[in-house]
Every structure is written in C-alpha cells, then in structure tokens.
C-alpha cells in the first residue's frame, strides 16, 4: 500500500469515528430531535425538553466584556500559523459558568439548577485576538429564547430542572441555532457520507 492510500485510509477512519462515536453534543442533538417539548405547567418527572425565555436571577459578568449575563462559555486558543500563512487553533483553556436561572413559556416558569450545564451550538458573542492567542465568549442572556434538555425533578412539590444522571446531560442552546441545525443537518450528513464513499473508492483504485 503506498503512502497516499495510508493517508486516505486515515481520513476514512477519522470520518467514520466522527460519525459513530458518542459524545455529549451528539446525545443532545439526538434527544432534541426525539423528545417532545414539555409545557412547564404540566412537566412530568424524568428527562424533559423545554423551550422558553430565559429569566435572570443573579447576574454573572462575562470575562471579556464584563457583560451581565446568566452564563457563559469562555475559550482561549493558541494560534499557529503555517508557512502559507494559514492559521490553526488549539485550546489552551475553556470554562463554562452559569448561575441558577428560570425558563418561562406560555404556561409558567421553572428554575434550572445549572450544575454541569453545557452550552451547544452557541455563536461567539465577543471575540478578539491578542498576540498568539484568540479569546472568545458565548453568553446566555436575559430574554434569550432557548431549548433546554435536563431532568425534571421536584423538591417540596416545586418542580425544577437539573442534570440528568442517566444521560449525563443538562444541555442548552438558542432556539434559532437549533432550528438552523435541524434544517441543514441532513445535508451535512449526506456530505460526510459522500466523502467517505469517494475516499474509499480512491483507496480501492490506488490499491489496484
């Protein structure tokens, strides 16, 4: 087998693993497509998906702009530049911080205990570059329309949402972001599948 075939085989293996291996993001995206949306007033105990508007209780202040927010994802990356001047980025530091908050829909509101929360498909709210580092933050703010998946529990007869122990998940995203994902995800999956087929055919030809 020549070196080109080895490289292409590695690409195929990478694409297959990327498609098949489970992670928190894939669990969240799969569950948001299969779970029905619960109304807050009638939410049942167990894994639940809710949609609504964020209500802030005690604000956090974001690392870059000191913007009052409910929560944030903060990322610091090292910038590497190749001989052609193209940049690549590697993570130096990342963190998610979130204070307790509420979600409100047309039927009521419910508190969210944010321990272990993960933010998915979030656009950068602020980003800048300094020297060989890039700094980015994505914010959850008062009034944002969101989709959240977590475990609906109750204490003293009062329902709340927390991280689900079985799926190891308390995930949140903007409704606008998940709508875009659901619209274009089938096209992305078809593209990746087509890439795997094409590369596999090239490897087969190189082996002849």
Which residues does each PLM region occupy?
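OB-fold and OB-like single-stranded nucleic-acid-recognition modules
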Residues: 2-208
């Amino acid at each position: 087998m020549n070196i080109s075939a080895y490289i292409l085989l590695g690409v195929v293996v990478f694409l297959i693993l990327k498609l098949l291996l489970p992670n928190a993001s894939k669990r969240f995206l799969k569950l948001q497509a299969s779970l029905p949306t619960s109304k807050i007033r009638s939410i049942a105990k167990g894994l639940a998906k809710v949609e609504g508007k964020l209500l802030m209780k005690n604000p956090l202040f974001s690392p870059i702009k000191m913007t009052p927010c409910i929560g944030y994802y903060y990322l610091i990356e090292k910038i590497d530049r190749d001989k052609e001047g193209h940049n690549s980025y590697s993570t130096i530091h990342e963190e998610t911080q979130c204070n307790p908050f509420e979600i409100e829909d047309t039927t009521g509101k419910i508190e969210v205990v944010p321990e272990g929360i993960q933010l998915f498909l979030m656009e950068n709210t602020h980003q800048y570059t300094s020297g060989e580092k890039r700094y980015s933050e994505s914010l959850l703010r008062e009034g944002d329309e969101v989709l959240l998946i977590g475990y609906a529990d109750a204490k003293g007869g009062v329902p709340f949402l927390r991280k689900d122990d079985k799926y190891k998940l308390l995930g949140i995203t903007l409704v606008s972001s998940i709508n875009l994902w659901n619209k274009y995800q089938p096209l992305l999956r078809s593209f990746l599948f087509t890439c795997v087929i094409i590369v596999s055919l090239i490897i087969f030809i190189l082996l002849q």
